[in-house]
Amino acid sequence: MNTNKIGVLLANLGTPDEPTTPAVKRYLKQFLSDPRVIDLPKFKWQFILNYMILPKRSPKVAKLYREIWTEQGSPLLAISRQQQQALQDYFNRQNQNVLVELGMSYGNPSIESATDRLIKAGVSKIIVLPLYPQYSSTTTASVLDAFARGLTQQRNIVPFEFIHSYHNDPLYIQALANTIQLAEDEKLLFSFHGIPKRYQTEGDFYPEHCQQTAQLVADKLSLTDEQWLVTYQSRFGDEEWLQPYTDETLETLPSQGVKKIAVICAGFSADCLETLEEIAEENKENFLNAGGQSYRYIPALNANTDHINALAKLIEAKI
């Protein structure tokens, strides 16, 4: 063990290996089998998942992935690799003995394999950074579960730090604010990934984190309450999710006199299917068809310099 080497595990949700129906089916099965995501009784849910949902959704989702796939592969994985390399370069420039690895909760590279690589490299400590600014049991906690699984085969468990959330981190808030320049009469919509309403009732404080992030960004930009709002996207199934829903809101705003909209997905650290297809394309079409005049998607922070600096400072605080 190198007593001076620090390991950093960047963690995100994951992506299929390729935009094909079999690959997407494997990915969705792993994702939707996580009880942190869907907490229905296992036998009942697995029957529904395997015989009703996967056969129907896999080809549809594969088609959507093909529309956003690039020469570098999945946008989420490509951008996550850029973030990993940018952070590694940052610590190298600072002459800090830090090794940055990337792991995904679902798909490849897995969190378990990333954990194993760090331990085999002889790190004396691991800092786990889930790339979810706002804590949720459906995302952040799943990272901790996977990291713990990665330690099960280790005789010696190295010390570790787990960054719980950074929804109100000043550098993260500033990085978001720096990407936003509202035009005249343009309203800002913060679209966060939704979770079932029941999860909030049971103690998940994700919506409070989302609201705090949006409020801090709005304050940084000196926006009035009428200039911005928070909605939730990507609901799944028949259960009630956090509201207001992004799609329904965008379809009704034009009739309320809001003709120009800028949408930012502040909870997504990297652009992915939910931002590039659902928000940048599908919801844009719905808003314009409902009478909107201008719809602008503000890209995720991805690997931009402000974002990398914010993440680096979060890590440095734990070294």
Curated annotation (Swiss-Prot):
One of its GO terms (cellular component) is cytoplasm. GO terms for biological process: heme biosynthetic process. One of its GO terms (molecular function) is ferrochelatase activity. Its EC number is 4.98.1.1. Keywords: Cytoplasm, Heme biosynthesis, Iron, Lyase, Metal-binding, Porphyrin biosynthesis. The keyword DNA damage does not apply. This is Ferrochelatase. It comes from Actinobacillus pleuropneumoniae serotype 7 (strain AP76). The gene is hemH.
